[in-house]
């Protein structure tokens, strides 16, 4: 189907070209005939004018006999005859127009300086120039276009789009290539060599550390000689060492408690001690149970007290501490046994506090808890 359409279009184009050639030949023939007619009319007018002049010269008596008014003579002298108004340059221009190839381009070659005369010759030429039949032919020829083919138009548009896209892609590639930094071969080689040297040093250090680990760990913990087995064996060995350390610390604590029990004196002389001595010993035991530790850091005081349990002891101690210009920031209470209590105070010294050293603070706290 496409081949048939193309053949039909080519045949139509061929017919149109033949019609144009025939029209052009007819126009040339018409131009030649009209130019010949114009030439004949000009020659007739010239011959007619010469005959009139000869008649006037041959018959002077008639001119003398005829009485012409003076005003008519002046009008004849002022108004030239239409036959004498014709100029040779315009005629030569008309003859030169016969050599033109296209009849519709005559107006471009007319002389613009020649004035318009009311002569039959000029009217005929103007009629020829503005012939409506010729203008219709010219418009038909100019308006005749090739038949519309949507496939060809679509292909041409696709080609244009592809060309535009290709040009844009090439420009982008050129820009990208320009933006890339150009490196010399020497710089690339130097970078490669430095990278190789750094990698060698890293591997060497890793091998040294792995060898040191392998020498410390027993061989029973290393199943293979690779890096993963060495690291895994080291982790297992460290865990076992931690367990052994915890067990040894527990054994040490148990031995210390047994030694303290053996050192308690078993003396029967205590049975014969008098009641006075027993009272004094009880007081010493009570005082020995009271333990006070004070640490001073600038305006902050950490106070730890261990004493026997008494009713209302904590409230009374807090009131007395406030009287000594201490503010309680934090308090922690623990009771290791039913008869003993330990207090942990976090205090802040105010500006009006007279106690500055740790010894003074411990002495004041001892008085509070002994009373």
UniProtKB/Swiss-Prot annotation:
Tissue expression as described in the entry: Expressed constitutively in roots, leaves, stems, and flowers.
Biased composition regions of type Polar residues, renumbered to the chain: 270-279
Pfam families: HLH
Main location: nucleus
Disordered: annotated span: 149-190, 250-285
Protein's cellular compartments: Nucleus
An individual GO BP term: cold acclimation
Sequence ranges of Basic and acidic residues compositional bias: 250-264
Protein name: Transcription factor bHLH70
Species, as recorded: Arabidopsis thaliana (Mouse-ear cress)
Biological classification of the source: Eukaryota, Viridiplantae, Streptophyta, Embryophyta, Tracheophyta
């Amino acid at each position: 189907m496409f081949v048939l359409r193309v053949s039909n279009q080519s045949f139509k184009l061929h017919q149109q070209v033949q019609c144009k050639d025939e029209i052009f030949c007819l126009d040339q023939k018409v131009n030649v005939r009209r130019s010949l007619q114009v030439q004949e009319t000009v020659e007739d007018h010239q011959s007619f004018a010469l005959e009139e002049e000869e008649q006037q010269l041959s018959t002077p008596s008639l001119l003398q006999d005829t009485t012409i008014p003076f005003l008519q003579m002046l009008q004849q002298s002022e108004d030239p005859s239409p036959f004498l108004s014709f100029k040779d340059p315009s005629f030569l221009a008309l003859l030169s127009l016969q050599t033109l190839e296209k009849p519709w381009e005559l107006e471009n070659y007319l002389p613009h300086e020649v004035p318009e005369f009311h002569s039959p010759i000029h009217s005929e030429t103007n009629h020829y120039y503005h012939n409506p039949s010729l203008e219709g032919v010219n418009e038909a020829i100019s308006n005749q276009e090739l038949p519309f083919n949507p496939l060809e138009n679509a292909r041409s548009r696709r080609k244009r789009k592809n060309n535009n896209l290709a040009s844009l892609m090439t420009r982008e590639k050129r820009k990208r290539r320009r933006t890339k930094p150009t490196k010399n071969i020497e710089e690339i080689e130097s970078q490669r060599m430095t990278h190789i040297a750094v990698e060698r040093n890293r591997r060497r250090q890793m091998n040294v550390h792995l060898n040191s680990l392998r020498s410390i760990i027993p061989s029973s913990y290393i199943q293979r000689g690779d890096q993963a087995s060495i690291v895994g064996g080291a982790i297992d060995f460290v865990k076992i060492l931690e367990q052994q350390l915890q067990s040894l610390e527990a054994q040490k604590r148990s031995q210390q408690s047994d030694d303290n029990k053996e050192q308690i004196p078993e003396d029967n002389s205590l049975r014969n001690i008098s009641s006075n001595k027993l009272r004094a010993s009880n007081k010493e035991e009570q005082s020995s149970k009271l333990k006070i530790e004070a640490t001073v850091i600038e305006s902050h005081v950490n106070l730890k007290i261990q004493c026997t349990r008494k009713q209302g002891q904590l409230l009374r101690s807090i009131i007395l501490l406030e009287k000594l210009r201490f503010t309680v920031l934090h308090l922690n209470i623990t009771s290791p046994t039913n008869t003993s209590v330990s207090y942990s105070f976090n205090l802040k010294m105010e500006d009006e506090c007279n106690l500055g050293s740790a010894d003074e603070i411990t002495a004041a706290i001892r008085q509070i808890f002994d009373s």
